[in-house]
């Protein structure tokens, strides 16, 4: 009887008996049909199509004939001479000899087939005659009747036995070592072929006594179908820039913005138009009659107001404008944006919040001026007064209107007016370009100095911002080096250097800036898994895109299909493990999420979920529990759980309860306590740390398991990543360019990797398999297992032990490189603490962020829960997903490592915004320092900072008040830099009144590691402080008056301004006869017509008349009472009250001095609107300045300022020669120092005392290309 040809690799297929051998009835027709089906498209390598149809030798014949075919592969002993004279390692000779021997054995087997023909013949009549011998083909394996057609049964049997994958020649199950016979499964050496056959049978590689289990086949089918089209096995070929960029960066900050207009934030506004009689109309409007443009407004009164970028020409609007209306209008809204209840009066603001609102206004002022002055080119002026100066060419159709404002000295008229007199006194040659050629090396020079209208404060802010960007600038050579370092040389980066091209590429960031930004990210995570989990998912997707490793679960199914099991077995180990590894109801992205977790072991602890542990602790007698233990043992080393080793140990200890006992030193954490509960270092059993405490007699398996863990648990290592010299490093507890790994790292093969069984994870898997074999071999633990089940289990473990998966080698060689390549570009840089392996004393127990300096005693009363943030996120992973990936990894057949990574990595580095995260870190650092500085101005944080605004009223901000203020700072920074995601949000929770940022982690032994990043300095903070110092001198320009006000009747015909009152009208606490109305003062009304008496601050009863001083708070709390009692005395002039304000917004009401004016209506309305939580803008009545004689009428003033607060007045009667009546002011030459003083250096400024309105402005002609525009990458 002929044997149906089977695919073989020179050995048994591993499926036991050939079930079709019993079903073969000798029919030539059936043999032909089966041969045509079996051999279709299944051609063994090295054989012809004709040879495929020849009958094949028996299993033992082929084994003996090909015993030397793979000797060098099995013994790994190349170069030695075997017993037949062949050189080991010469695969050509050995394979040819094996093929010849196999062919001879086949011929001998074919000759013997005629002698083995059946003695019983069959005919078709037997089917209908029960008394005749029926055909054996109608009987199934159990002896029952089988009505399926023979062709169907043969096809089913063939598909169950024969692999659909091409066979490989030369993989026999055994090989001769020269000194014995070696098993290729466990490498054991036997002394005779019979001993070897018996040994091979123990692995489940039986000959004709067993057959492939239908249970295995069913589970293989279900296993393959369940994995079909699963995302983990789909390798995406799409590595386009856009999709990769979405994973690598969030918003691109708007760091570089340009302004081609005027560099000024202060605008001269006409307040009152010129009022002149008809007889001098032509004289006054001489310049208008001849269409001569004036550099300044021609008005009776003009003032300076804040209006950022009022003459700008920008490429992007930072949307942080500070626009102040003229003082004749109400500007109270600028001082009530923050910390003012919506129920307050529309016209009022809380005076205790003035300082916070002023600080916010100054921050907006600075943010709206973070522009670079753009170089726009020049043209020579042909007008006579500029002496051929080179004036800047402005873009836009309305450029002409700006020249008179930019260059006041271009005007020249014989008219007599304050404007013309000012122009005549100017230095004529300080106009236009200054001391710099326009062309440099054939291109526009990178910077140029220009004399033009600008204010010194805006020029200083933009100059500091430009200097900050210049410090961040990197040249193409540095870019080339940095990108090559980050890409580990897999991408060839070149940078052609062109000296004539001026580039500004601000990507250099310091370590301190990145560390501060990293701490903010860590605080953002806190203990919230929903924040970090998307980050890990994105990294896992990115790893899948660039990795050559492909997860192919058919490797597992094909391996299990070679396991031999008896048909009489009630349990199937191979079927059981296949069922365990199916992807139902599991997140099978856990494998690459676990790899991503390696980058963040300082804040994320990846653990194995409870469902992966044996149910209720499990039992060693359960096959299901044994596979749970196997899956768990393979997956645990890939997690970042520092307690993973003890969990692995206790998992088996749980299963051994009742069989083996180990000494446990904790009454709560006993041997029966679930292994997942051992999640902290104090729960580690002493016997696990000192395995000598485990008796090798009472607990031999657990002693062996503990020894395996201590010896074979993977060893941590590290790899270089990033370019900290250029891009900085966010590492906090590790060196700047070190990336830690929980397993050993070996250099990768730069060409084609080959299968390697010497890596740590493969050794670990082998030891786990050997341990399980010891378990199943011992009848003490498996008393109910039959020998067939034990053999099947051992065979399954041997298959898993030597499964041809590339994943362990990938994890040791390529995965670290992939992590190191993508780590420098991640929005969340790696945050790691050292991996400790089995060193319990070094296990990190706490990672926290502190906002307060511990060495400062005088701190606000803060709660530790709001100033210290403990971070840490446990992230549960499915052990089955990790184990599937470990057992089923493969590489593309044509893989060349360096070529693969060049193609995969290049699109990431070719993205134009790949390193925008560095700029974001710089902005985060700026925002943090700005917040700390500003909060220190309104609360006591002991942070060393100059407080220029202490004279402005403010309460001592609480945590909630400071948080509201911090929220506005955060919003302003995000708006200015065009950011939509989180910036300072982590600092808004808790208490933002911080003095420093520090992070620490503590080990189990009590040792604490603290990192306090040094604040590297913030240009935004410096600019805000500069603006505050200027505000301290030039507060009137910002709509704020300083000092107090005096309420009392003053009638006069003298045309003076209440913002600059005569000195004799002002009194203070030191003035004789002045009384102070304190908090404990009382009013005693007189009896029988006597005047009321008041007990003053000294306790004396004095009449309520004369000069008094009231604190503003006292007036606010008693506003209704005081208004009713004091208005009569104030109106009659018998009572004058000085209200101590400190600082206050004001509003001007101009009146015609020729008409009688009384300010009581303004005063009474203002008094009525005062409330305990708000005050309106203080109204002042000011006469209009006149350039001719007038008849002045009496004016009654009720509110005057105690200090000079008229610095915002620019000029009166600017189109006239002089002011005759009313306040008089000429164009302030002190604000045009370099234009009017020939001895002043051209670059001299007078900040912070005076804001100059004409300066030298440096303008730049830089290009700002992305990194990818100046380097050429070759994939």
Curated annotation (Swiss-Prot):
Q: Where in the cell is it found?
A: Virion
Q: Which GO terms describe its biological process?
A: 7-methylguanosine mRNA capping
The EC number(s) attached to this protein equal 3.6.4.13
Zinc finger regions, C2H2-type: 181-203
Could you tell me which residues belong to the region Disordered?
Answer: 1-147
Superkingdom of this protein's organism: Viruses
Cellular component per GO? viral inner capsid
Pfam families in UniProt: Lamba1_VP3
For activity, the cofactor(s) needed are: Mg(2+); Mn(2+)
UniProt keyword terms in alphabetical order: ATP-binding, Capsid protein, Helicase, Hydrolase, Inner capsid protein, Metal-binding, mRNA capping, mRNA processing, Nucleotide-binding, T=2 icosahedral capsid protein, Virion, Zinc, Zinc-finger
What spans are recorded as compositionally biased (Basic residues)? 1-12
Tell me which positions the record assigns to the signal sequence: none
Q: Which GO terms describe its molecular function?
A: ATP binding; ATP hydrolysis activity; RNA helicase activity; zinc ion binding
Q: Which reaction does it catalyse?
A: ATP + H2O = ADP + phosphate + H(+)
Database matches in InterPro entries: Lamba1_VP3, Lambda-1/VP3_sf, Znf_C2H2_type
Q: Where is the composition biased (Polar residues)?
A: 55-66, 118-139
UniProt feature, compositional bias: Basic and acidic residues: 18-35, 80-98, 105-117
**Subunit and partners:** Homodecamer; each decamer is made up of two conformers of VP2, called VP2A and VP2B. 12 homodecamers assemble to form an icosahedral capsid. Interacts with protein mu-NS; in viral inclusions.
Q: Which family does it belong to?
A: Belongs to the turreted BTV-fold inner capsid family.
Its job: Inner capsid protein that self-assembles to form an icosahedral capsid with a T=2 symmetry, which consists of 120 copies of VP2, with channels at each of its five-fold vertices. This capsid constitutes the innermost concentric layer of the viral mature particle. Displays NTPase, RNA 5'-triphosphatase (RTPase) and RNA helicase activities and probably participates in transcription of the viral genome. Helicase activity might be involved in unwinding or reannealing dsRNA during RNA synthesis. RTPase enzymatic activity represents the first step in RNA capping, which yields a 5'-diphosphorylated plus-strand RNA.
Name this polypeptide is given: Inner capsid protein lambda-1
Originating species: Reovirus type 2 (strain D5/Jones)
